[in-house]
Amino acid sequence: MPMNVETRETKKVLNHLPSEETVEKTLKRLQTFSGDQSVVVGLSGGVDSSLTAALLCKAGWDVEGLTLWLMKGKGSCCSDGLVDAAGICDQLGIKHHIVDSKEIFQKEIINNVLKGYEEGITPLPCSRCNKSVKFSEMLKWVKENKNIEKIATGHYARIRYSNESFNENDLPSNGIKRHKLLRGKDLNKDQSYFLYDLPQEILGRTIFPLGELTKEITRIEALKHSLKTAKKPESQDLCLAEHYGSMNAFIDKYLPQKKGEVVLKSGQIIGSHNGIQHFTIGQRKGLGIAWEVPLHVVEIDASLNRVIVAPREDSGKSECIVKDINWVSIEAPQEPIKVEVQIRYRSKAVKAKLIPIFDSNKENYCYQCHIHFEEDQFSITPGQAAVFYMGDYVLGGGLISKEY
């Protein structure tokens, strides 16, 4: 029995060693940038942003907290998040600022999401919110408060700045130095997929202190710091779904139901639906159709108010068009390159060939590209992001287009 107890205690100590070493490395890296620098931390009221603020304080930064008020009511983006964020700032002894961003959130996110569903696409509000609301609002606030130099958030991603020296021999380059975005070390929590659209100006002023940590280490460190949010449950849903109860509840509140047809790829009508906004590519459940084989949504035709379905084996595609591209770690390529493409959050990046499509009206810049996958992909969904990787580096990304 004593041996078992000793073994358990030994394992407990050993399990904590990587945590200590990783956090020490993170603190040293933060300290090399600190000096007399100031930073504002985007605080959501969750454990990730709370530990971000705590680590920066410990590393010697002059820290202030900022929370965006995005929606009225309860939830992480609403009053609950504001209260928890204020509590963390009080605990850490730092200033807390609240920015009323409800109007821009309505315009850039809610209106855009609803428009997308009406057009038969599946919007990706998180990446749009990061670029057009969260980081842009924080940058705007920083510029108005000239004593603040940097922005920090609790995202699980990493940045290599243009003045840092790293081995990047495998990255295509034309000699122009860029701030580079990388996956977070914790691949189970990596959020780089949602950050592909951040411009260079924002990346150059942003810090991701949790980029080298795992979620488990974050929890351990939050408990060590006795942070009030250390045991707060993680949000499992989009903020819109959390706020309204579900995405369907959100959609039903704003978009009217409109009866339409469910058809096979041949055009044969096999059922009906109450609104294309309730469907997404790849969906199998909730079709309300009994068929000899399982059917999946393969296309949504907004012009005809139709949902097209097919067996899984008939729904794979080997290519797609990606539009509205933001190039991150490299300049826009001038010729085809081999990449790995991630077409959904948490999905595995797959090998593909990226062929630039040049716009003669925009100085032959590559805002679109043609993606040829090495193997057929299931559920290539218009409106979702296709993010291009080379190893851990985010080369760029854009939105999957309906046009092909």
Swiss-Prot record:
The keyword ATP-binding applies. The record marks 155, 384 as: Interaction with tRNA. It catalyses: S-sulfanyl-L-cysteinyl-[protein] + uridine(34) in tRNA + AH2 + ATP = 2-thiouridine(34) in tRNA + L-cysteinyl-[protein] + A + AMP + diphosphate + H(+). One of its GO terms (biological process) is tRNA wobble position uridine thiolation. Its EC number is 2.8.1.13. The active site is at residues 129, 239. Disulfide bonds join 129-239. Residues 189-191, 344-345 are annotated as: Interaction with tRNA. GO terms for molecular function: ATP binding; tRNA binding; tRNA-uridine 2-sulfurtransferase activity. GO terms for cellular component: cytoplasm. Signal peptide: none annotated. The keyword Transferase applies. It comes from the Bacteria. SUPFAM superfamilies: Adenine nucleotide alpha hydrolases-like. InterPro entries: MnmA-like (IPR004506), MnmA-like_C (IPR046885), MnmA-like_central (IPR046884), MnmA-like_central_sf (IPR023382), Rossmann-like_a/b/a_fold (IPR014729). ATP binds at residues 42-49, 68, 154. It is an enzyme of class 2 (transferase). Pfam families: tRNA_Me_trans, tRNA_Me_trans_C, tRNA_Me_trans_M. NCBIfam families: PRK00143.1 (NF001138), trmU (TIGR00420). Belongs to the MnmA/TRMU family. Catalyzes the 2-thiolation of uridine at the wobble position (U34) of tRNA, leading to the formation of s(2)U34. This is tRNA-specific 2-thiouridylase MnmA. The gene is mnmA.
